[in-house]
Amino acid sequence: MIITTPRRANMSSESGSSASTVHYAKPVLRHVPMPSSTTPSSIGSSSSSSSSYASSTKQTPPRSPVIRYPTVVVSKNSIATPSSSLTPQGTPSYAVPVSRNQMQYSASKLQYEHMRHRCKMLDDENQKLMRMQSDVVNDANRRVQMHVNEIRMLKEDNRKLAISNKELRDLSCFLDDDRQKTRKLAREWQKFGRYTSSLMKQEVDSYHQKMVSIEEKLCTKEREVDELRQLCMYLDEQRQSLMSNAAANVDCDNESEDLGCGSSEQSGGSEGHNDEEKHHEFNKCFNKHKESTLRRIMATSMCSEPSEEEERREVSKRERSRLLGYIQSLENRIKHLEMSQNHESFWNSSSNVGSDCDEKTIIERGWLGEEVMSNSEDCHLELKPVMTTSSTSSSHIFGNDKCPMFDSMTSNMTSSGCTTYASSGTDGDSVFVIGDEIDIGNLEVRTLSRIDEEATSASDTLKESARMPPKIAPPICSSLVLTNFDNMSEDCAPRLMRSASETCRPTTTLISSTQPAQRSVSVEKNNNNNVHTHN
């Protein structure tokens, strides 16, 4: 009989090594008929049965895990067959001890022993399987723990990446906003640049036009300045020629007075001849082209724009006020010097020779006396002055309206306009030399050099006059009236008081200029002889 046990059975472990319950299947008992004698037929039948069982076992595939259980072959014969022939292929065979008295052992007892041994083996196998299962479970738990840790790490990395992704998204949004703002700002700057470039182009064009106009005006001003310079030179020549003519007239008058008694016809003829010569020389000294240019300039100045005329008037008013202040200061200084020098008298010569020191004011003569003495031998004048004999000093009238004479107190108060040499009442002569009377604003201040004296005592007189100014008498009724001074009214015309010599009588000199082309002079002499000169 063959007893086969399945893989599992339901029983409790007797050894007590494991407290767990293991379920096993019930054993299957198979009866194998065995012949009474060992015949070849019986052997063949047994071998065939074993081979059939082996084939049946071979046909069924093994399960995983493959566990093979031992089989026990129990035979009633006394002769035991070899295990290799009775057991299937690949299954171990176990020898069950059988007593010699075969009748004593029953089938149930053999089954019990077999079951007991089998249960012990199954328990060991179960323990082995439990150990294997625990190892597998531990390994699975270890792997699960490793995977859990890996998942945790991946989650942490994912969280960090999400945070960095959010930061990058915010940064990209910020950069995009900044880019949009920059683009808007760039467009605004581009518009502003276009506007400024167009504005700068307009400004450059306007300034270029202004520069061109200013250059044109500068060229015209330069031409006008050249013309005015030439005209000034021409006027200076006219003044010098008129002064020389006046000196010649004075000499002729003196000669006519000496030859007047007893020869009236001869003196009359000589006077007519002299007048013709003077008129001819007077016409020679005039240049028609320059005179026409001068008239044109005066006409254009009269027809100038009202704004320029107003500016010119304001400038002339300021200059006039400065001129009046300067003249008043000079008068105050003159009064002070008169009061301080009344007790001194050293000017006792019978004649007064005109010089450049005489054409200066008293203050300037006191300040520049030493300089005139040092330079008296070096400087010369081209024309000779008008000389009059007198026991007192000469009085000079200067008119100028230029700014340079206010800048320096040592400038010569002379002009190209008028110069008067007045003598005392001893000889009864008075000479007035008139130049080119133009508008006062157009007069030029210039420094005159020393005049060469004709008298023998000129150098002595110059040194003496440079050391100390002459004695001045108290102010009298002599006055200088300037009319048509920028169209001023007569009540606003300045009346300047002057001081004359001790023996000089009241003398009035009137200079009137109503038009630029007209010149009028009236001189009242002390000897009741009126001399009128009209140019």
Curated annotation (Swiss-Prot):
Residues 109-172, 198-242 form a coiled coil. This is PAC-1 interacting and coiled-coil domain-containing protein 1. InterPro entries: CCDC85 (IPR019359). Belongs to the CCDC85 family. GO terms for cellular component: adherens junction. Keywords: Cell junction, Coiled coil. Pfam families: CCDC85. Its main location: other. Residues 36-57, 526-535 have a biased composition (Low complexity). Disruption phenotype: Mutants are 97% viable. However, the Rho GTPase-activating protein, pac-1, does not localize to adherens junctions. It comes from the Eukaryota. It comes from Caenorhabditis elegans. Interacts with pac-1 and jac-1. Residues 503-525 have a biased composition (Polar residues). Linker protein which helps to recruit the Rho GTPase-activating protein, pac-1, to adherens junctions. It is found in: Cell junction, Adherens junction. Residues 1-67, 254-277, 503-535 are annotated as: Disordered. The keyword Coiled coil applies. The keyword Transport does not apply.
